[in-house]
Amino acid sequence: MRAVFASFLFALLCACSGAPEQSPAPESPSPSAGDRVSAFLQTYQAQFFRGLPNAEQAATLAPHFSPRLNALFRDALAGQQAYKAKFPSDKPPMIDGDIFSSLFEGASSGSVDAVDASAETASVRVKYVYNDPETGKAIQTWPDRFLLVRGESGWLIDDIEYLGGWDFSPRGKLSSALSETAALGD
């Protein structure tokens, strides 16, 4: 009887040891760099504001941005308010116009056109379209580039490079314009 019991126990142990280990459920992947930019575009276009975002608007957009860019927005808003206090009859910088694209009037729509990502940074080219408000016909198209960094929660927008090639379109990067406005508060 002991031999039967020992054989049974041996067979049971062999069967159990061959069973594959259950691995934990895979974590849901963080959004891609392109997904982050698409989500930002949806959030921003639903807000429809111009110039620097106020505190409430900035809070809505903040989850899309890196800590560095969020700090630049806070500093630029403080610089803008300091400028208003010093020069109440002057129009402060970044008070109107679309600061998230090359076109002052803003885009009617934007979509991710190309993504180039490495382990820690990504570049996402967005194709923007501006439609004539009366006819709805596209009258301007252009690319701009979003620069992202990988944060703890995934990809975060760290800057925007203006690529519009017409007269009076902004040049350079959003971070530079924010820094210049922030310096007005010093």
Predicted regions, residues:
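Core segments of small alpha/beta cavity-forming domains
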Residues: P26-M94
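Bacterial signal peptide processing site
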Residues: S17-P20
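Positively charged n-region of N-terminal signal peptides that target proteins for export
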Residues: M1-V4
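Low-complexity, intrinsically disordered terminal/linker segments enriched in charged
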Residues: T121-R125, V129-D144, G151, L156-D186
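Surface-exposed, charged secondary-structure patches
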Residues: S66-G136
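Extracytoplasmic/periplasmic, Sec-exported soluble proteins
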Residues: S28-A33, R50-P53, L61, D116, ...
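C-terminal motif of bacterial Sec signal peptides marking the signal peptidase cleavage site
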Residues: L13-A15
